[in-house]
Amino acid sequence: LGDASLGMGRDYYQKEDVKNTEALAEYQKYVASMLKELGYKNADAAAKGVVDYEKSIAKHLLTNEQSRDNTLQYNPKTIAELSALVKNINLPEYLKKVGVNTDKVIIGELGYYKNFDQLVNANNLPVIKDYLKFHMINGGASYLSQKLGDTKFAFYGKFLNGQQEQRALDKRAFEVIDGT
């Protein structure tokens, strides 16, 4: 089982320095701009909630160094063991409803699941909805419209990675087909 996605690498949320503080501020603006495209009237406040939520998730994820250690990412658990960690969801019932029939799962981020009930509960449901909406539009931005694709490139391509210009549409199309 995987964990929740972050919009940037874990260290941006956890290492407090000038570079990461600037990146988080730009990321929050980016999240707000994407939520505005979804019609949010309170996009700035929702974006702050999304970024704060991702910070709370990042606290429980492996560091880059730890994630290279396969023994830390290989955590076999029975459904009963996982259910003891994750109490806010009736896991056996959920797995049955989605058609998964298994007695064991392998968890890559055990810290996330140990803190799942703190991260996913009725009290933070509104921010979780904003988080999910943002990640849906962010994931498909390059395919939804030129404006969304350009906005995504401006943040991830230019700001985070220093690319001067976006690759040509035909090259990007081949990358999608090739899965690269």
Identify the role of each PLM range:
Residues L1-T180:
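Noncatalytic, helix-rich "gating/capping" subdomain that lines the substrate-entry/channel surface
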